[in-house]
Amino acid sequence: MKFGSKIRRLAVAAVAGAIALGASFAVAQAPTFFRIGTGGTAGTYYPIGGLIANAISGAGEKGVPGLVATAVSSNGSVANINAIKSGALESGFTQSDVAYWAYNGTGLYDGKGKVEDLRLLATLYPETIHIVARKDANIKSVADLKGKRVSLDEPGSGTIVDARIVLEAYGLTEDDIKAEHLKPGPAGERLKDGALDAYFFVGGYPTGAISELAISNGISLVPISGPEADKILEKYSFFSKDVVPAGAYKDVAETPTLAVAAQWVTSAKQPDDLIYNITKVLWNEDTRKALDAGHAKGKLIKLDSATSSLGIPLHPGAERFYKEAGVLK
């Protein structure tokens, strides 16, 4: 009986030990899932998101241990912010102006409430304001858009709000132009056919559709500069100066303009240590190599501009890393 009791005690102990070991192993191996909302698969956000997701995932020795990051295609800035707010995404890419409006409840988010938990993880690269004009339209400045047929992009887009800000700085409203509200693709086709004089587009240069227009029809880019640009920069923290270099588009001269920024945002509810570790891996040498080799815009993602265009607060975890790295005081 004693021998049997001893066997039973050993068996119970062994089972308990196995359960404990299994539980500790499960805890050690439990993955943390971290989704990055991007944009359409044909755009820039999606491939950049894929590069970053691969870099920060903890599959090897170079990522965040236990982290499983994935790039998720989406409808872009507004959709990503709304999904972060609802908890459907842990993070996402957005234009800096859209992030600013969401956080402050203005612009596109006027009357929709503030997204007060929105936090910045990193500013990535500039997204340039293009005012694309027909070469024969004789549009030399924004003021020359008066009375012209101009597409401002669709209602609900970030571009249309940017366009209105630019027009206002030059003393114009939509009533002063023959405004149309087309996506960039249809706007380019209308311009090509002579049914449109100019259109606004926000994105990195060179972009394929505008390059094709420059080759097939000839275009000019309308500058945004001088006191009007300074007025915009003073009023809106999410804008910065930019220049489209000569040759970015066929036979188009260097053009001063403004830009917003592509930003990686998350929620204040994400753990500080997690965001700290993600930010740290984002800026290590291996991620640098992956970004440089993986996409043209990857080369523009730099640590020294990671905290620029601060229209919303940094996540505390990201802020801790940037202070350690000397980017923030």
From Swiss-Prot:
Annotated CDD domains: PBP2_TAXI_TRAP
Pfam hit, one: NMT1_3
Disulfide topology: none
Keywords assigned by UniProt, alphabetized: Signal
Protein origin, superkingdom: Bacteria
InterPro entries: TRAP_TAXI (IPR011852)
Signal peptide: 1-28
SUPFAM superfamilies the record matches: Periplasmic binding protein-like II (SSF53850)
PANTHER family the UniProt entry points to: SLL1037 PROTEIN
Further remarks about this protein from its record: Brucella abortus is the causative agent for brucellosis in cattle and man.
Protein name: 31 kDa immunogenic protein
